[in-house]
């Protein structure tokens, strides 16, 4: 496995965070190059400026030979404590992305393991995510399983 380093990113690298977030959104949502993402990116900027310093979002980059090749994020939040999550602490794994040309080298797995470790260091054991069919194997290999009994309500789609 190549030498891939995962590092946490702060708002001091906001420009890079936003650049990667836009790349992820364009790829995952198949947005055309000419799609206007300015309002969405302003919302992401406000989110990062608030959530990263407050510790409710952990962002990381994967680097190979000093080049950033991937990213990931972890949104931390509370829910009502329950028997399956007595602390009520939760982590939502998101924005896991590796640039084409660097996929298949274990980078995604390293990003996921790093972020799981960040959650566990904070005693958060309820970690969940949404996945695409191409990401399912990665997440299953990290120990994630299908969530049953969940539903989603969306408006305006």
Predicted regions and their residues:
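Conserved beta-strand-loop-alpha-helix junction that forms the acyl-donor binding cleft
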Residues: 127-137, 152-156
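Conserved acetyl-CoA-binding loop of GNAT-fold acetyltransferases
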Residues: 140-150
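A short helix-loop-beta-strand connector motif used in the catalytic cores of GNAT acetyltransferases and
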Residues: 46-61, 92
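Conserved N-terminal entry element of GNAT/NAT acetyltransferase domains
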Residues: 1-15, 157
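Conserved GNAT-fold acetyl-CoA-binding loop/helix
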Residues: 25-47
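Conserved beta-strand in the GNAT
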Residues: 61, 67-76, 92, 97
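Conserved acetyl-CoA pyrophosphate-binding loop and the N-cap/start of the following alpha-helix
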Residues: 102, 106-114
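Conserved GNAT acetyl-CoA-binding A-motif
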Residues: 112, 119-131
């Amino acid at each position: 496995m190549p030498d891939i380093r995962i590092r946490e990113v702060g708002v001091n690298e906001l420009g890079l965070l936003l650049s990667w977030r836009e790349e992820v959104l364009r790829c995952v949502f198949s947005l055309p190059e000419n799609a206007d993402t300015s309002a969405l990116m302003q919302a992401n900027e406000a989110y990062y400026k608030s959530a990263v310093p407050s510790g409710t979002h952990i962002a990381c980059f994967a680097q190979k030979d000093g080049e950033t090749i991937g990213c990931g994020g972890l949104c931390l939040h509370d829910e009502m404590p329950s028997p399956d999550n007595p602390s009520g602490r939760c982590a939502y794994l998101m924005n896991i992305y590796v640039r084409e040309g660097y996929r298949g080298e274990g980078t995604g797995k390293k990003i996921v393991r790093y972020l799981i470790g960040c959650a566990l260091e904070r005693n958060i054991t309820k970690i969940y995510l949404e996945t695409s069919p191409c990401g399912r194997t990665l997440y299953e290999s990290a120990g994630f399983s299908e969530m049953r009994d969940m539903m989603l309500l969306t408006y305006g789609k």
